[in-house]
């Protein structure tokens, strides 16, 4: 009897969980207003990869930490990966990537990059807000990421969103072996963070 109940429970609530997950990972192309400027938001496509690599090079002094194969492998994993891009006038300005781990209930930000000339305009905050909200919808415990020790501007943004430093990874980054700061957002304590940025025509003021 107990086995039958467990099987019934798993079928009913497991399938419901899967529906919620599929809905959460789905993103419709839409326009958003961030600080009164209109942008276009969409899921990343394979055709976006060359521009994503160019943004990496612009951000990381000519280096591209991820190559086209790495990005393509990520985009194929639609069940547990989500990559979004922001465009204006058909130019890719920013992107973000995240893994969604059902076992640990953690959304891990794998990539976030904004063209230097568009930094400080709220694009990074907006993209993080989307991922945070999706993790909340999935009832996850945390959103996590790594950031260079030297990247104080990014650290300020993450702390403003209530991320906390949880550790240091020594020699983490390829090439220069710079240390990384581990940071986590504990969602049950910060459910109201990053409400902006998940619906069409959303206004991001910070």
Kindly give the residue locations of the regions a language model identified.
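C-terminal "cap" of GNAT-fold acetyltransferases
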Residues: 148-151, 171-206
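Conserved hydrophobic beta-strand within the GNAT/NAT acetyltransferase core sheet
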Residues: 109, 143-147
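Conserved glycine-rich acetyl-CoA-binding loop
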Residues: 115-129, 138, 149-156, 160-161
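Conserved N-terminal entry element of GNAT/NAT acetyltransferase domains
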Residues: 1-46, 189-196, 200-205
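Acetyl-CoA-dependent GNAT
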Residues: 5, 34, 43, 47, ...
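Conserved catalytic-core motifs of GNAT/GCN5-like acyltransferases
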Residues: 26, 146, 159, 164-179
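Solvent-exposed beta-strand sheet faces enriched in polar/charged residues
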Residues: 99-101, 146, 166, 184
């Amino acid at each position: 009897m107990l086995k039958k109940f467990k099987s019934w429970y798993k079928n009913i609530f497991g399938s419901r969980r899967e529906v919620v997950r599929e809905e959460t990972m789905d993103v419709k192309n839409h326009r958003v207003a961030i600080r009164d400027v209109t942008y276009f938001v969409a899921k990343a496509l394979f055709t976006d990869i060359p521009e994503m690599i160019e943004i990496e090079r612009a951000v990381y002094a000519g280096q591209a930490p991820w190559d086209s194969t790495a990005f393509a492998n990520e985009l194929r994993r639609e069940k547990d990966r989500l990559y979004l891009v922001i465009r204006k006038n058909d130019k890719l300005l920013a992107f973000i990537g995240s893994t969604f781990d059902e076992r640990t209930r953690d959304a891990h930000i794998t990539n976030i990059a904004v063209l230097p000339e568009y930094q400080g305009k709220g694009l990074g905050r907006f993209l993080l807000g989307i991922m945070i909200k999706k993790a909340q919808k999935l009832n996850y415990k945390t959103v996590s990421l790594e950031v260079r020790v030297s990247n104080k501007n990014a650290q300020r943004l993450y702390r403003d969103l209530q991320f906390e430093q949880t550790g240091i990874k020594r020699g983490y980054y390829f090439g220069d072996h710079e240390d990384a700061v581990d940071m986590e957002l504990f969602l049950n304590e910060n459910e109201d963070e990053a409400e902006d940025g998940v619906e069409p025509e959303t206004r991001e003021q910070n």
